Amino acid sequence: MVWVFSVWAITLDRYLRLAVLLVSVQCVACTPEPEPVNDIGRWQITDSFILSAALSKQGQHTALLFPQGRLAVWDNDTQKRLVDLHAPDVLPDTSMMHMDESARYLLSATRTVVQIWDATSAEPAGSLDLSAQLGDASITSLRFILAPHSFVIGTSGGDILFADTRSDEYHLAHQHDADVVKLIVSPDGELYSAGNDGLVVRWDEQNKAPEQTLTVPHRVTSLEVGLDDNVFVSDALETQVIWQSQHNEIISELAYWERFQWFRVARFAPVNPWLITSSPKTEMIIWQLPEGNPIAQWWAEAQGFGSTVLDMRFTNPATLRTVTSDGVLQDWDIADIAEQSGSY
């Protein structure tokens, strides 16, 4: 009798779960489709293939790196090209670049050589062959600390190279065990690095030594630093956390239910307690902090399977500007998008 009851109970449980599933499917089917999110401004800068893109601090300028040694800067307000540098001035095998916050200076790099550019005059401001310092390693990331003379290089050997061309001083610090893929300077001037080893480091620039570290299980794909030393860290599989680097503690975690998903670019909103992320493609999500709940979702324009958001900046507290690998610049009213979602 007990056995019969158990079988009956299991069967009933299966029917109940099936009924719940059917009701859920019907409810989802009856749910009205959300209104499409439209940009409030769009401009296709180019239809040429892009290696890299960067926006200035408030999104007023866009720098694009093209194959075969071409580097160009546009004024996004006037939609005019300000700088157009070509090979052989730009080394043909240049594979990465960085623009300082003011858009006055650019860094570009091959595997071993860094070039510095003055965007106001479209003239080279310096060149540095780091082969001797790198050894068998190569450049994997770069960023100005104080443009144009002071900058930092991440390498495939896990080293951080602090360079100052004015004083001709170079310091190599080893902390990572794999490629250093992210370098970022916080609003208050703190330097952070992240690598394919899952290590995130907050650096003491004066002593060229780590102040705090955080380790996540997999390679770091997204790194963003906001106010109050709050750092967003996402790895390649399932870790998306807010790290308070001053106190070295995790203060929030995104409620992200999909495994094997990751983020590429992220920005903290300047006024609202929000974090905005982009997927490896063009999906955009607004997250409510500190709860870590998603409150809105939309997609930037994609013109192909490989389209992705390469950078984003707030032009003002309410407007986010994105630039994609298709050369498309779009503006988004973030408050309006959140309001449309019904979560704001």
Per-range role (PLM):
Residues 29-344:
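WD40-repeat beta-propeller superdomains and closely related acidic/aromatic-rich repeat-like regions
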